[in-house]
């Protein structure tokens, strides 16, 4: 059966006959779902038997069988009789002898259970709850079945009085009209398999007319009107299809006679003389009205039944309403149903799959899934996607699909340039020590012509051996020092290869190995090569670096001389080898985030070219003196136990003390004005390092970048290494803090301070990388580079640092030749190197930073970096100080790698590594969050739009910006509000470009907090100290003229050019809510944890540093250790004068910590009331620049070195000064 039918009680007089079947009252009869149902008389659609037969489609009035002989084993109840039926050709039928009332039930229908029916006239199909055929009840055999199988079907729909229904896999006949004695029992014409009321609520696509009394639906208004003619409780209300006047005329014979003459067909308007003729005609219309299945022979009177039947053929294409139990085969009907019946529901249904959406845009986006066009294709596996987000997810989850672009440093593969750039921020490589970072053009030593980028490219071709190994590193012509040191002693295992492969230091094709035997013989006989670039001991360090035995001990390295200036114009096209392409320029910082594009960087490079060509003219006439001095050096021999000859070791290092005077002046200025003034005063950082500058000032022009190749790796302890923060979190650090990078004293919430809080502000080393100059030009990527390093610095120099470092035991003889592991080549310590995150700084390192010779070689800087780490570790771990031994060499090595504490090395190795991409994380929580980028897990779901995120901060930002429409960041200049700090910063840069205000990158909450009185006091104290210092140092003689020129001219010119170049590329300040980009950035925040959200503390009022400075100013002026707490230790420790200079500048910088909480904008504004606020900072910057020029012009009049000294004497005097504690005299002695 095709219904969950309901049955009435059996007739009482049939109880003896059908005693085996218990009486089931209709009110208690459960339906197929087991729920008791109530009687309903609105029954329309009993169905014909055996409608599943494929060979037979029953037609009303068709003959089934001839009259048969009734066997004795099929008894008929006494109140019924078997005689010829009124239905034409139907044979015998059942007639009643008594009145049968509505609601009585007969049954069940008895027969054999079969899988199919032999004779469709004598059987029924039993259906399950999903309307699938379970089995058939077949009563076609003469001796099988009950008397119910002789009940015939009515010829037309108004003659029936019984309907069939299924109850628990049994068929019953129910009376739906009163049957008078002598009437035949007739089933509903073409009776459907289930009653109308059980079928209609599930499927009736076009029945949109509802009865308000019984909630029954009809296909047309006419049907509803017919239904409403009778009360809903009467049996004919559901089936009355006859006109009211027709039923009234049936009551009288006269009317019947009239009807016989005027019978009219309602379907085709034909008129018949009598009712019988009309009924015969109606049979033809009934046949035409059948709804036949186009996939099987079944036919139905109701379209809804046909639809339900067709669902069994294609079960995968029915669309269910999400708000009710109705099912539709056409999604348009489902959509119409939802709009009409369910107000406010998702009314937009997909025509392909039926999925509904609340908006048409959501449906349009969803339709792309069914589209055959998939434009987003994976480059590796060529799998295509209709949406870009799906392609990104695919690449995250499949590591193999990210291997397209190879990292030049570590060999790791990536699928996109942006992912490669992001990786390069964390990767060790040549771009951390790019050519300009060590031999920047325009930075010419005395006697060295300034070079543009083209000439440096020429040198790259001239020296392929070193160029292949160190990438873009070049050696400028005219330098009197080698690219590798003149080591007469060597470190056999000084530079292990590490985990990442590098090409051989001197490839087989290199001119080093390609020298002829004659050339080798000649060069081995001479201590020096013919070109002044090379010193004789170059071969030793090359052997130590490369560890290639093929380079013989007696084979010096030959580097081809610089090509003539005539060749340069023809090789300008080789600029691309200077990493001017997008990948090479941007990758050192991973600047794929916002503002810096390849064209931006190229424009910077081009502008730098023109600038350096002009600056280079002023040094060309200085070439010959230095070359002559270099030729004198070529005659010197070197011992195996000292770098320099004994005669040179006897000289005094006068130039070292003069360097100290310049450093002191820079420290005074830096203390008051941050690091904005003479940003790159090259010796500014030396005081914070364990050694002084190795070269006198005549070698160093004044540029805005530090001389040293390790400004990014400030002194900080190993246990505090962290991954770089994302720009988003960096901005949180900026908020409420000053623009000076030195007050970022945040520490992680879950970490305790490793040292006691000192009574005075910790001495924080200044970094030329982290300068406000960079901040004022950068985007989020630049800001991240500037703010990353500082939170860890103050942990390094705690209150106990001085005693721990200076009271080290005497050096052990076994450690005389230290062999430190270059940390930057060990992936465990790669975090310390991941700080070149600024494309601007990468360019400045390449093209603006001078790097004299081997001292600033990348690997040697790594050695010094190791020494800094060990000293820092000694300050934090007193028990480890005994391992830090001092070696009397120019490099001041501390300890061999095997002497490192085991817990120190284990600290890095216990990091957590991603098994998909190999990234290393300091904590398991960071690794867990990072793994979500590979697995696609997004546990944080938005409660408003069901969008999910892998990081909770992304969800919070999404809710704040998209749903809550919050804009908490307000510009204090124009009152414009923004949803993100980065957008506000970009907007503030636009103000700065228009000279509206100098609040480029500082947070708006940190602006304009200082008072004019404080600034005036600082101005007076600043110039007073400069005058006092210059007065003390005026006893010296004059310095070379070219230093003053470079100090006063080229520095400010270059800085201005850089600012102009970068400001021209700033983005528009329109707020971009690009959540995809922010998500990628926050994936990188996994490395740093929650450091971006930690509070910023200030050391402003700790220990009253101003009083301390006034008390110790006399000591500072004589280059002695300034803090009182260091005074006793310096005589006990026996450290060299290098440490004296370091502590001197440290004490100066301690004073600077007092001012760190004031941003640059605050410190650079006048207190005068008549100057507009917008003009204060530009005017004050100009005044500071003039003050610096005056200061340096006066200080440069001191005698730095006698002109008769050779450049080699300079080298030897410096080395002697670095090795012997008594070599450097105070400024008062100069």
UniProtKB/Swiss-Prot annotation:
Polar residues composition-biased segments: 515-528, 586-600, 778-787, 994-1005, 1030-1041
Any Pfam family the entry gives: PRDM2_PR
Region (Disordered): 510-530, 547-618, 718-821, 990-1009, 1030-1113
Sites bearing Phosphoserine, chain numbering: 624, 726, 740, 1037, 1039
GO molecular function: DNA binding; DNA-binding transcription activator activity, RNA polymerase II-specific; DNA-binding transcription factor activity; histone H3 methyltransferase activity; histone H3K9 methyltransferase activity; histone H3K9 monomethyltransferase activity; histone H3K9me2 methyltransferase activity; protein homodimerization activity
Compositionally biased region (Pro residues): 755-764
Segments of skewed composition (Basic and acidic residues): 560-575, 606-618, 1042-1057
Residue stretches of biased makeup (Acidic residues): 1066-1086
Record's comment describing the protein's domains: Both zinc finger regions are required for the transcriptional activation of PBX1.
Name listed for the protein in its UniProt record: Histone-lysine N-methyltransferase MECOM
The species this protein was found in: Homo sapiens (Human)
């Amino acid at each position: 059966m095709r219904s969950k039918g309901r049955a009435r009680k059996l007739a009482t007089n049939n109880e003896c006959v059908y005693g085996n079947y218990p009486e089931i009252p209709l009110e208690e009869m459960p339906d197929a779902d087991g729920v008791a149902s109530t009687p309903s008389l609105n029954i329309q659609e009993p169905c014909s038997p055996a409608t599943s037969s494929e060979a037979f489609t029953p037609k009303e009035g068709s003959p089934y069988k001839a009259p048969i002989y009734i066997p004795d084993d099929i008894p008929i109840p006494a109140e019924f009789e078997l005689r010829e039926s009124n239905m034409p050709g139907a044979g015998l039928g059942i007639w009643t002898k008594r009145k049968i009332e509505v609601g009585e039930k007969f049954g069940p229908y008895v027969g054999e259970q079969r899988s199919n029916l032999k004779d469709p006239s004598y059987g029924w199909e039993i259906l399950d709850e999903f309307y699938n055929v379970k089995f058939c009840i077949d009563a076609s055999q003469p001796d099988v079945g009950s008397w119910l199988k002789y009940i015939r079907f009515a010829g037309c729909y108004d003659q029936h009085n019984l309907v069939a229904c299924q109850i628990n896999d049994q068929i019953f006949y129910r009376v739906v009209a009163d049957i008078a004695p002598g009437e035949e029992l007739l089933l509903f014409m073409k009776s459907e398999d289930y009653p109308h009321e059980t079928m209609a609520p599930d499927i009736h696509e076009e029945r949109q007319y509802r009865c308000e009394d019984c909630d029954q639906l009809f296909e047309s208004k006419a049907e509803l009107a017919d239904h409403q003619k009778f009360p809903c409780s009467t049996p004919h209300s559901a089936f009355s299809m006859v006109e009211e006047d027709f039923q009234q005329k049936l009551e009288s014979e006269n009317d019947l006679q009239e009807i016989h003459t005027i019978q009219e067909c309602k379907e085709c308007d034909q008129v018949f003389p009598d009712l019988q003729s009309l009924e015969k005609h109606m049979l033809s219309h009934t046949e035409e009205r059948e709804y036949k299945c186009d996939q099987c022979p079944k036919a139905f009177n109701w379209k809804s039944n046909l639809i339900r039947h067709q669902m069994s053929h294609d079960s995968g294409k029915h669309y269910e309403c999400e708000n009710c139990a109705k099912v539709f085969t056409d999604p348009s009907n489902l959509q119409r149903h939802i709009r009409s019946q369910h107000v406010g529901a998702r009314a937009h249904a997909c025509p392909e799959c039926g999925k509904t959406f609340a908006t048409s845009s959501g449906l349009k986006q969803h339709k792309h899934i069914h589209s055959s066009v998939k434009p987003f294709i994976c480059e590796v596996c060529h799998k295509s996607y209709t949406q870009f987000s799906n392609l990104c997810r695919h690449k995250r989850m499949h590591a193999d699909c990210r291997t397209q672009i190879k990292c030049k440093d570590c060999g790791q593969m990536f699928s996109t340039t942006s992912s490669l750039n992001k990786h390069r921020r964390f990767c060790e490589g040549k771009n951390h020590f790019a050519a300009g970072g060590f031999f920047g053009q325009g930075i010419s030593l005395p006697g060295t012509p300034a070079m543009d980028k083209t000439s440096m490219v020429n040198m790259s071709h001239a020296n392929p051996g070193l160029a292949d190994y160190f990438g873009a590193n070049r050696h400028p012509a005219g330098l009197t020092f080698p690219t590798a040191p003149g080591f007469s002693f060597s470190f056999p295992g000084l530079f292990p290869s590490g985990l990442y492969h590098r090409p051989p230091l001197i490839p087989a094709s290199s001119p080093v190995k390609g020298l002829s035997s004659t050339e080798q013989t000649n060069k081995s006989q001479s201590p020096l090569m013919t070109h002044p670039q090379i010193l004789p001991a170059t071969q030793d360090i090359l052997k130590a670096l490369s560890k290639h035995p093929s380079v013989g001990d007696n084979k010096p390295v030959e580097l081809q001389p610089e090509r003539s200036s005539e060749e340069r114009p023809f090789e300008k096209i080789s600029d691309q080898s200077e990493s001017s392409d997008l990948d090479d320029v941007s990758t050192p910082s991973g600047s794929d985030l916002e503002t810096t594009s390849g064209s931006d960087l190229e424009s910077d490079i081009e502008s730098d070219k023109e600038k350096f060509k002009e600056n280079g003219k002023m040094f060309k006439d200085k070439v010959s003196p230095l070359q002559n001095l270099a030729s004198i050096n070529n005659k010197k021999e070197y011992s195996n136990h000292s770098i320099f000859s004994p005669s040179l070791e006897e000289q005094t290092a006068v130039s070292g003390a003069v360097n100290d005077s310049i450093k002191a002046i820079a420290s005074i200025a830096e203390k008051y004005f941050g690091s904005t003034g003479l940003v790159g005063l090259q010796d500014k950082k030396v005081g914070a390092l364990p050694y002084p500058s190795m070269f006198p000032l005549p070698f160093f022009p004044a540029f805005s970048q530090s001389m040293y190749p390790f400004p990014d790796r400030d002194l900080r302890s190993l246990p505090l290494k962290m991954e770089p923060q994302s720009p988003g979190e960096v901005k949180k650090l900026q908020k409420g803090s000053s623009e000076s990078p030195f007050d970022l004293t945040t520490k992680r919430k879950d970490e305790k301070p490793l040292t006691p809080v000192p009574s005075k502000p910790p001495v924080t080393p200044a970094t030329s990388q982290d300068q406000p100059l960079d901040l004022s030009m950068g985007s989020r990527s630049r800001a991240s580079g500037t703010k990353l390093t500082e939170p860890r610095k103050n942990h390094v120099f705690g209150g106990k640092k001085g005693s721990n470092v200076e009271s080290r035991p005497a050096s052990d003889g076994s450690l005389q030749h230290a062999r430190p592991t270059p940390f930057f080549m060990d992936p465990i310590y790669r975090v310390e190197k991941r700080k070149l995150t600024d494309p601007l700084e990468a360019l400045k390192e390449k093209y603006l930073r001078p790097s004299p010779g081997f001292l600033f070689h990348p690997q040697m800087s790594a050695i010094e970096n190791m020494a800094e780490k060990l000293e820092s570790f000694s300050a934090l771990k007193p028990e480890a100080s005994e391992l830090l031994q001092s070696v009397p060499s120019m490099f001041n090595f501390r300890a061999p790698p095997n002497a490192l504490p085991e817990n120190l090395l284990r600290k890095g190795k216990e990091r957590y590594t991603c098994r998909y991409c190999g990234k290393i994380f300091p904590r398991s929580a960071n690794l867990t969050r990072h793994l979500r980028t590979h697995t696609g897990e997004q546990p944080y779901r938005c409660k408003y739009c069901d969008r999910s995120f892998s990081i909770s901060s992304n969800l919070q930002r999404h809710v704040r910006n998209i749903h809550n429409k919050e804009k908490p960041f307000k510009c204090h200049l124009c009152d414009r509000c923004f949803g993100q700090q980065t957008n506000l910063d970009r907007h503030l840069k636009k103000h700065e470009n228009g000279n509206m205000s100098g609040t480029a990158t500082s947070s708006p909450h940190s602006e304009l907090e200082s008072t004019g009185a404080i600034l005036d006091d600082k101005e007076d104290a600043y110039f007073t100290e400069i005058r006092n210092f210059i007065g003390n140092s005026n006893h010296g003689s004059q310095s070379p003229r070219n230093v003053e020129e470079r100090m006063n001219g080229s520095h400010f010119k270059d800085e201005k050019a850089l600012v102009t170049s970068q400001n021209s590329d700033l983005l528009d300040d329109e707020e971009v809510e690009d959540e995809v980009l922010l998500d990628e950035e926050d994936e990188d925040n996994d490395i740093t944890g929650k450091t971006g959200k930690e509070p910023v503390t200030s050391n402003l009022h700790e220990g009253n540093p101003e009083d301390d400075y006034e008390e110790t100013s006399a000591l500072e002026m004589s280059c002695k250790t300034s803090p009182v707490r260091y005074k006793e230790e310096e005589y006990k420790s026996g450290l060299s004068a290098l440490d004296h200079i370091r502590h001197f500048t440290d004490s100066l910088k301690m004073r600077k910590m007092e001012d760190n909480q004031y941003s640059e904008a605050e410190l650079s504004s006048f207190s005068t009331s008549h100057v507009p606020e917008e003009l204060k900072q530009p005017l004050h910057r100009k005044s500071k620049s003039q003050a610096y020029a005056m200061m340096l012009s006066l200080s440069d009049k001191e005698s730095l070195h006698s002109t008769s000294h050779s450049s080699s004497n300079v080298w030897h005097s410096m080395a002697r000064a670095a090795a012997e504690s008594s070599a450097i005299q105070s400024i008062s002695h100069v």
